[in-house]
């Protein structure tokens, strides 16, 4: 059995340069977005998600208000509505991801 010798890399490593990985081209963001800019961009790309989030928050708020006032039937209805709004929001997110994935394909 032959023992392997020392491994000599094909390209010498230079600490001053970033590592080279085949098939990877890192991108450097030259103009980072602020929170507001990113929120507006994402809302324009998929406007249904914020609507679903607002519907979920509204149903939760009104349901808690009804519970506090002692109206248990209305409170239960709002909690069920909240679950439906959450499902709608998750479906909108998944649909948005699918559309984005289809757009990025050549």
Swiss-Prot record:
Pfam families: HIG_1_N (PF04588). GO terms for cellular component: mitochondrial inner membrane; mitochondrion. InterPro entries: Hypoxia_induced_domain, RCF1. The lineage of its organism: Eukaryota, Metazoa, Chordata, Craniata, Vertebrata. It comes from Homo sapiens (Human). Keywords: Acetylation, Electron transport, Membrane, Mitochondrion, Mitochondrion inner membrane, Respiratory chain, Transmembrane, Transmembrane helix, Transport. The keyword Membrane applies. It is found in: Mitochondrion membrane; Mitochondrion inner membrane. This is HIG1 domain family member 2A, mitochondrial. The keyword Mitochondrion applies.
């Amino acid at each position: 059995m032959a023992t392997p010798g020392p491994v000599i890399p094909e390209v010498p490593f230079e600490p001053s340069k970033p590592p080279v990985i085949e098939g990877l081209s890192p991108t450097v963001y030259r103009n980072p977005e602020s929170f507001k800019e990113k929120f507006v961009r994402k809302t324009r790309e998929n406007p249904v998600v914020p609507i679903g989030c607002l519907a979920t928050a509204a149903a939760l708020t009104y349901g808690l208000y009804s519970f506090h006032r002692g109206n248990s039937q209305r409170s239960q209805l709002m909690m069920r509505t909240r679950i439906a709004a959450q499902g709608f929001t998750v479906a909108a997110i998944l649909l948005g991801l699918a559309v984005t994935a289809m757009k990025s394909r050549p």
